[in-house]
């Protein structure tokens, strides 16, 4: 659809048409009634006139946009306000009266607009160049450029140095002049701290709140021409082609996105060469052969076996040491024997040759405390705190109780005086016990070191026994082994199990129910289900034609034998088959 023409444009077109038509008295046309009759046919003819497509296109091209409302003058605004007031107040008489005019004539409006456009005629680039040429400024600039120009059109080195020199001198002069001004003012801080002049901000347009009064807001918005941008206002450019920097940034961002999308399946580190350090094992060549590798493997195996033997020997030695130490402490406690190297040697020899048992304790003691032991000088002594000899001391004290009753008070007094001395004696006793224990350990270790071969033989013997108890090679190669299960007959007799066929037994209960990995709950549930009396009767009736199963049948007089098992006649034809498969179904009884 073609755009609507503005009032000024319509006025200009009307003026052109009137200039083409013979001149008439416009005043009489406006005032007289006959003029109205002559204007009506012209208006009807103009309505019936349809412009062609070319004319419409030319009009659209020639038409200029009124972005800032320059065509809306004060007179037009007043007319619009009068029309709105008349509509609001329902002044239909005023609106329908042809004599009342709210807007001025189009001719005068067009003339005013032409005068305004003439006053503010823009200066184009051509006009600017023309003005420079006429004034002669352009020729002066060309002469100056020609003086400093070179053959290739660039500025010469001499002229460049001259400009830099003059610029440097000007900067030095300006710096000295600033220092003189600072000294004359007498304020040292003026050069560094200067108060900024308050910026006079232009007050914005005060518009009423549109939510409170829309009509007042619209009226003020039109009166103040708030739609026209002022200097300093932020302008949002909707045309991206105007800003070259924005175009470059947008193109870069678009290119990055396109590359990222096109190469999204590629390896991001494909362009980098990753290097790996060479290991020392593969860096140099070695003369390894298959024989050498086998020798190394054998050597490692031997070292491993040797280390295991050393570990086992050390464990055995520690075990024997603790055992001998306990025995010696027990002998000292019970028999009051003094521990020496000969006694330790006898005990170690006895225990290493034969395994020590509590039943043979008397024999060991008899070997230790023989005639040689009693022929030694001195006699055994026991500690007063000993449990075994405590009764003996108690009896001795009982006999002399009457005699010692009088002396108790004196002993108590002596004990109170000798309290600190007893504490010292207890510490000395502890140290003495530690020394004796350390001495016993040293004696036992020396004895075990002398009998090291016996310990090694014992360790090797235990290793051989362990290997003999372990599974053989064939057993190790087996991936499956049968597992023993508890026997279960599920309410059937041995005679019924041997007499029934495989299909009948599988119908009664399948072999899957005997799986050892089944849980106890499932096995108990299957057992309750299978051993129901009704189910047993039905299965026996179907298999043996008898609800009670196979009854004991007596053998004939000439063929009585305790080992004979009689089978019913109906199943006689299948007896061979049953006997051949009887071994398979023994699992129903044994399991």
Swiss-Prot record:
Keywords recorded for this protein, A-Z: Glycoprotein, Nucleus, Phosphoprotein, Ribosome biogenesis, rRNA processing
Region of interest called Disordered, as start-end residue ranges on this chain: 1-70, 142-213, 281-303, 375-442, 454-478, 548-591
Keyword Ubl conjugation: no
Residues the record lists as Phosphoserine modifications: 177, 184-185, 486
GO biological process: endonucleolytic cleavage in ITS1 to separate SSU-rRNA from 5.8S rRNA and LSU-rRNA from tricistronic rRNA transcript (SSU-rRNA, 5.8S rRNA, LSU-rRNA)
Biased composition (Basic and acidic residues): 10-19, 191-206, 464-478
The record's account of how the chain is modified after translation: N-glycosylated.
GO CC, alphabetical: 90S preribosome; nucleolus
Binding partners and assembly: Interacts with KRR1.
Protein name, entry field: Protein KRI1
Gene: KRI1
């Amino acid at each position: 659809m073609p755009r609507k023409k503005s009032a000024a444009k319509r006025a200009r077109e009307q003026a052109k048409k009137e200039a083409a038509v013979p001149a008439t008295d416009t005043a009489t046309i406006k005032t007289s009634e006959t003029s109205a009759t002559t204007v009506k046919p012209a208006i009807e003819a103009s309505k019936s006139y349809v412009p062609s497509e070319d004319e419409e296109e030319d009009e659209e091209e020639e038409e200029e946009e009124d972005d800032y409302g320059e065509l809306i003058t004060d007179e037009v605004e007043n007319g619009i306000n009068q029309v709105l007031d008349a509509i609001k107040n329902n002044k239909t008489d005023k609106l329908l009266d042809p004599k009342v005019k709210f807007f001025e004539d189009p001719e005068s409006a067009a003339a005013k607009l032409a005068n305004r456009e003439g006053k503010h005629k823009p200066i184009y680039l051509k006009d600017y160049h023309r003005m420079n040429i006429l004034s002669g400024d352009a020729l002066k600039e060309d002469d100056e450029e020609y003086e400093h120009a070179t053959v290739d059109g660039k500025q010469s080195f001499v002229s460049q140095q001259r400009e830099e020199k003059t610029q440097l001198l000007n900067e030095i002069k300006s710096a000295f002049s600033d220092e003189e001004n600072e000294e004359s003012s007498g304020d040292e801080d003026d050069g560094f701290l200067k108060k900024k002049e308050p910026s006079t901000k232009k007050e914005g347009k005060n518009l009423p709140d549109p939510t409170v009064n829309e009509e007042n807001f619209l009226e003020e918005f039109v009166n103040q021409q708030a739609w026209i941008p002022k200097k300093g206002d932020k302008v949002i450019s909707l045309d991206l082609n105007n800003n070259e920097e924005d175009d470059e940034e947008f193109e870069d961002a678009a290119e990055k996105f396109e590359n990222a999308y096109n190469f999204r399946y590629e390896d991001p580190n494909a362009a980098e060469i990753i290097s790996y350090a060479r290991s020392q094992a593969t860096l140099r060549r070695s003369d390894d052969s298959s024989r050498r590798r086998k020798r190394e493997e054998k050597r490692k195996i031997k070292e491993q076996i040797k280390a295991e033997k050393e570990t086992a020997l050390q464990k055995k030695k520690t075990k024997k040491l603790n055992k001998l130490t306990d025995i010696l402490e027990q002998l000292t406690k019970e028999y009051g024997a003094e521990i020496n190297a000969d006694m330790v040697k006898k005990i170690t020899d006895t225990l290493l040759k034969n395994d020590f048992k509590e039943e043979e304790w008397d024999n060991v003691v008899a070997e230790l405390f023989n005639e040689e032991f009693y022929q030694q000088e001195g006699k055994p002594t026991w500690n007063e705190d000993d449990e075994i000899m405590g009764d003996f001391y108690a009896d001795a004290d009982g006999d002399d109780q009457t005699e010692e009753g009088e002396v108790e008070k004196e002993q108590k007094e002596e004990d109170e005086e000798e309290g600190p001395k007893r504490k010292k004696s207890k510490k000395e006793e502890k140290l003495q016990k530690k020394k004796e224990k350390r001495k016993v350990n040293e004696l036992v270790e020396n004895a075990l070191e002398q009998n090291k071969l016996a310990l090694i033989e014992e360790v090797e013997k235990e290793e051989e026994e362990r290997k003999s108890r372990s599974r053989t090679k064939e057993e190790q190669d087996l991936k499956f082994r049968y597992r023993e299960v508890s026997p279960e007959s599920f309410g059937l007799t041995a005679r019924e199990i041997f007499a029934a066929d495989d299909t009948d037994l599988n119908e009664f209960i399948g072999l899957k129910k005997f799986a050892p990995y089944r849980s106890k709950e499932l096995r108990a549930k299957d057992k309750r289900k299978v051993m129901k009396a009704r189910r047993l009767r039905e299965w026996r009736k179907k298999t043996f034609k008898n609800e009670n199963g196979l009854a004991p049948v007596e053998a004939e007089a000439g063929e009585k034998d305790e080992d004979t098992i009689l089978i019913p006649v109906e199943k006689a034809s299948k007896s061979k088959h049953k006997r051949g498969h009887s071994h398979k179904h023994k699992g129903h009884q044994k399991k």
